[in-house]
Amino acid sequence: MYGKIIFVLLLSEIVSISALSTTEVAMHTSTSSSVTKSYISSQTNGETGQLVHRFTVPAPVVIILIILCVMAGIIGTILLISYSIRRLIKA
């Protein structure tokens, strides 16, 4: 019974992955023209300048906070699993 459930879950994951990849291709082709328009390099006196883009680099504090939150999530998950195993062994 569990084998059939696992098989169905794996098949549904394959279908969702293939659907996701086809939508990414469609999104890429539709946005390629807008991306190329936004990346216009400024040229002065024959020299090429830096690429112009709309995205900004996050501050180092934001990057550090993201890393710490990911670490806390992983450590919390490990502690929760070990706590659950200890509770199951006692019961």
Swiss-Prot record:
Glycans are attached at residues 36, 38. Residues 82-91 are cytoplasmic. Gene3D superfamilies: 1.20.5.70. Keywords: Blood group antigen, Cell membrane, Glycoprotein, Membrane, Sialic acid, Signal, Transmembrane, Transmembrane helix. Pfam families: Glycophorin_A. Changing residue 48 to M: In S antigen and Mit antigen. It is found in: Cell membrane. Coiled coil: none annotated. Component of the ankyrin-1 complex, a multiprotein complex involved in the stability and shape of the erythrocyte membrane. This is Glycophorin-B.
